[in-house]
């Protein structure tokens, strides 16, 4: 699986937050993404991979250097739906990037 395929898979999970929820994480979609990430970490050789009750994913990669932590959140804004996302991939060739009715200009 290449990096584009991975990211397209990640955005398929409905991970928007639920501001009314008192649990952590606030939605089942966030737990599901965490579980998928844990499986990927195992598949690429990390050990002691686990997802705790709050959805945090941990793994260990043996090495000789100092420890390094990579931290990111898995939730997205509750302002828009996280369901039925239809990502668009564009091979960027420089210049202005058209985004529907708007543009992204370097």
Indicate residue ranges for each PLM-predicted region:
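Structural signal for hydrophobic packing residues in well-ordered secondary-structure cores
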Residues: 11, 15-18, 41, 45, ...
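Active-site metal-coordination/substrate-binding segment of hydrolases
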Residues: 66-106
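N-terminal capping segment at the start of a domain
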Residues: 2-28
């Amino acid at each position: 699986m290449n990096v584009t395929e991975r990211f397209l898979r990640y955005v398929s999970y409905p991970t928007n937050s639920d501001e009314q929820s008192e649990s952590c994480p606030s939605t089942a979609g966030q737990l599901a993404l965490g579980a998928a990430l844990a499986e990927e970490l195992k598949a690429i050789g990390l050990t002691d991979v686990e997802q705790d009750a709050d959805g945090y994913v941990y793994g260990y990669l043996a090495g000789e250097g100092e420890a390094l932590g990579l931290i990111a959140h898995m939730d997205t804004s509750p302002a828009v739906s996280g369901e039925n996302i239809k990502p668009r991939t564009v091979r960027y060739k420089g210049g202005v990037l058209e985004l529907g009715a708007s543009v992204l200009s370097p």
